[in-house]
């Protein structure tokens, strides 16, 4: 898979909980804003540099907006960026292409570009 990342500046890896990467990295806990995640978040042992990234977000869903407000009020390390629910992501996965290449003007492609910018702008990842 390493041969397939030539030309990319950033790689996102989905690692199992508790598996520590051996290279410097940003730690993001990716969750849906739902009741299941809400219950589990308060039992999660947070690393000092870990941030919470909400995915499949829809600002029209009152429950999701309410949970975000609760998480902010509770002091959870919420990243000031959400990945909205966008059909372009599923279509890109089905086509086995990065969403930025498959649908570069989609909302989720712009949000992932913003996430990449945030990751790169933070400088060297602490480890």
Where are these regions (language model features)?
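Switch II (G3) loop of P-loop NTPases
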Residues: 1-24
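Conserved Switch II/interswitch segment of TRAFAC-class P-loop GTPases
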Residues: 22-45, 58-63
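Beta-strand-loop-alpha "switch" segments that mediate conformational coupling across diverse proteins
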Residues: 56-60, 68-103, 112, 118
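Acidic-aromatic/histidine active-site loop/patch
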Residues: 48, 54, 125-127
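Conserved beta-strand segments of the P-loop GTPase G domain that flank and frequently precede/overlap
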Residues: 12-15, 28-33, 50-56
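Short, well-ordered alpha-helix to beta-strand connector turns
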Residues: 8, 24-26, 47-48, 75
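Aromatic (Trp/Tyr) and acidic
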Residues: 107
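C-terminal alpha-helix
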Residues: 114-126
């Amino acid at each position: 898979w390493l041969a397939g990342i030539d030309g990319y500046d950033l790689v996102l890896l989905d690692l199992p909980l508790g598996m520590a990467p051996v290279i410097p990295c940003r730690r993001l806990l990716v969750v849906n804003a739902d009741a299941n995640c809400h219950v589990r978040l308060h039992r999660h042992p947070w690393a000092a540099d870990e941030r919470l990234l909400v995915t499949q977000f829809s600002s029209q869903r009152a429950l999701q907006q309410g949970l975000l407000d609760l998480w902010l009020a509770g002091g959870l390390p919420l990243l000031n960026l959400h990945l909205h629910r966008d059909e372009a992501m599923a279509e890109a996965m089905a086509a086995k292409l990065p969403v930025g290449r498959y649908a570069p003007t989609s909302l989720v492609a712009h949000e992932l570009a913003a996430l990449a910018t945030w990751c790169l702008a933070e400088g060297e990842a602490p480890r």
